[in-house]
């Protein structure tokens, strides 16, 4: 449950952050993780997940970012999301959000693999809930919820109970996405949100995210954790591969498939080249 790019042309070369050319737009630091150290201790051992990890997401073009984190199990991808969401603190280090150190009061929505809703409430009640909690007028809250319900493709489902089997798993994830965005967050975290869905629902939900990302009234930085290279390339304009022991950034890519991409881009040579390049680098990891 959620709480409540400039172009390479046809090149797919991984680049360090320091080489990014920003043109006339001054890049905005969205997220900065500095000198992050994460140690898990037991009576008999000490496991170091991160040892002075640095991780940065910038809004390069002034249009938000869709960033994906790839990596094998245990490299710390989901832990990074938990830091940003405020669900976990590192052993040491700084977490900076839009130039300010993150506090316990900060709430950043996060969507997980297992869909979650309040099953005793309707779809529109679920989506409007974060605004109701903030004491927004009910009419205003429901109007905003209706807008997002339409964007995520649930028109006509507003008054259904938000539970399975009245709604499918894919529909319940749409409810979660709409609820996470209704209070106008600047960041949305996605931890393997579609891995439990069939390919049809997965493709449809990918398109929902792209529709939201392209919507000029929804200014959100999306951060996706996934094991699916094709999904990461399709959705992202920035992509990171992580390695483990200790967890750190291994490669970084800018993905230039255009802001108005759709499923047909998956048949293009440019998309295929990106996927092959990322796969080759990913497969070098131990």
Give residue spans per PLM region:
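Conserved ABC ATPase signature
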Residues: 163-167, 171
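Conserved ABC ATPase "signature" region
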Residues: 139-158, 210-211
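Conserved ABC transporter NBD signature motif
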Residues: 93-104
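Hydrophobic anchor residue at the start of the ABC signature
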Residues: 177
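Conserved catalytic motifs of ABC-family nucleotide-binding domains
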Residues: 184
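Helix-to-loop junction immediately C-terminal to a conserved catalytic motif
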Residues: 85
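Short helical segment in ABC ATPase nucleotide-binding domains corresponding to the A-loop/adjacent helical element
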Residues: 124-132, 142, 146
